[in-house]
Amino acid sequence: HGAGIGVPVEDEVSGKITHINGVDSMKDKVITLKLDIRYPVTFKGDELFPKIEAHVAQAGGKAILNHNTSPCYKPADTQEIKTLLAAYDHVTGEKGVPYTIGGGTYAKHFDNAVAFGPHFRGMPNPCGEGKGEEHMPDECNSVDYMMKALKIYIISLIGLNELSL
C-alpha cells in the first residue's frame, strides 16, 4: 500500500493508498511500468508525486506523471449526502451508510457531484453465484432491484432540487 513507490500514506476517510501496475513494456532496453495510483482523499497528487519521483530515482529509474485526477469526495455531513441517504433510508427502511472507494468515477468530471447508487444488502443475485456482479461479465439486476433504485433516484432528485446549492 504505497511503500513500494515511496508513499505509504492513508487517511481515516478513504484508507490506504492503492496502486496497480497496469501495463508493462520494453523498448530499446528501457522498461516502462504504467501505474494507476488511487491516493487518499485528504492528500494531493502534486504533494505525493515528488516523493514517488525521489523513490524511483533511488532505484535508478525515472518517474513521469502522465496525468493527475484528484479524488472525488464530499463529507457525509453535507446536506447533499444527507439528502441522498434520507432517500435510501425512506425506500429501503434501512439506515444507509456512505462509504468511499478508490475507484474512478464519472462524478470527478462534474462540479459538486458524487457517485451514488444503491447497494441492497441481502438482495439475491438473479444471475447466480459468481456472475452478474457490478462491472463484471454478465452484469445484471432484477426488475425489483431496478424499481427500488428508481424510487431512490426520484426521491433523491426531488430532495436535491429543494436544496439551495
Regions found by a protein language model. Give the residues of each.
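Short amphipathic alpha-helices in soluble, non-transmembrane regions
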Residues: E47-A57
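Zn-dependent metallopeptidase/amidohydrolase metal-coordination segment
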Residues: K27, E94-L163
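A short small-residue
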Residues: T32, K62-H67, E129-P137
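Flexible, glycine/charged-enriched surface loops at secondary-structure junctions
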Residues: G2-V13, G60-N66, S164-L165
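Generic secondary-structure signature for well-ordered alpha-helical cores
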Residues: H1, A57, G61, D89, ...
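A short beta-alpha structural unit
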Residues: I20-S25, K34-V41, K62-I81, A87-D89, ...
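Midchain, well-structured core segments that form catalytic/ion-binding scaffolds
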Residues: H1-F43
